[in-house]
A protein has these predicted regions:
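Short, small/polar-rich loop/turn modules that mediate ligand/substrate recognition or access, typified
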Residues: 181, 186, 241-243
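Conserved mid-core segment of classical short-chain dehydrogenase/reductases
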Residues: 74, 96-115, 138, 158-161, ...
Length: 255
């Protein structure tokens, strides 16, 4: 088996949530370059999603859905299966990362932040995985790749809801790995540190020097640094990886 063959995703249908920008968009581009049919899920900008599809071409389809809504994510998955027959790879990438510190004074805002974060970062991923598994079982297997974070292990004092949600996602990955391998469904996680994305932009603008000082490689990661690992996990090269988490943080945190 040559290197080109090991990364070949020809004939595979890949669903990527939150794929109109950042890590999701770059992952979509790389999956399509490897031959996959890519569903670019998004909730915000039609123009951003259309731009990603335009860059990829005929291998990509944009599908709008708020995956934090249980009925919307069900319709998304049902529509993908109805149109393409199955789901071979699910990448749970959609997430929210909002300032919610312990010393804030607004209790209602604190609660809203936790609910909003868990609705998208945890419940949406769990629901999407549960729905995708149905198609994967019928097709003889599949892969679920969850995008967690360094925060799952390190903790975040001003984003505690985010860190807790990503820790839950890591555990969800392990549970899927243990419970679904019998159906040839495997699950893995990636845990990026700070990456140059729109979501991380406010923190990077405010604390870039401090953040870089934590990273032995002395740079913030790129979306390509993460997307390349996700492609590896989705490809035949990642077939025996199940339940683990790959750190992508330049050495700023070790499990």
């Amino acid at each position: 088996m040559d290197v080109k063959t090991t990364l070949d995703l020809s004939g595979k249908t890949v669903v990527i949530t939150g794929a109109s920008r950042g890590i999701g968009a770059e992952t979509a581009r790389r999956m399509a370059a490897a031959g996959a049919r890519v569903i670019v899920n998004y909730h915000g900008s039609d123009a951003a999603a259309d731009a990603v599809v335009g860059q990829i071409g005929e291998r990509a389809v944009a599908m709008r859905a708020d995956v934090a809504d249980p009925q919307a994510v069900k319709k998304l998955m049902d529509d993908v299966v109805a149109r393409f027959g199955t789901i071979d790879v699910l990448v749970n990438n959609a997430a929210v990362f909002e300032y919610n510190p312990f010393d804030a004074d607004d209790y209602d805002a604190w609660q809203r932040g936790w609910r909003r974060t868990f609705d998208l970062n945890v419940f949406a991923a769990a629901n999407a995985a549960w729905l995708a598994m149905r198609a994967m079982r019928r097709a003889g297997g599949g892969k679920i790749i969850n995008v967690a974070s360094r925060a799952a292990f390190r903790g975040e004092t001003e984003f505690a809801d985010y860190g807790a949600s990503k820790a839950a996602l890591v555990n969800l990955t392990r549970s899927i790995a243990r419970g679904c391998a019998k159906d040839n469904i495997v699950a893995s996680c990636v845990a990026p540190g700070f990456i140059e994305t729109e979501m991380a932009k406010p923190e990077l603008e405010a604390h870039r020097e401090e953040i870089i000082n934590q990273i032995p490689l002395r740079r913030v990661g790129s979306v390509g640094d993460v997307a390349g690992v996700i492609l590896f996990l989705a490809s035949p090269m990642g077939d025996y990886l199940n339940g683990g988490t790959i750190d992508i943080n330049g050495g700023s945190w070790f499990q």
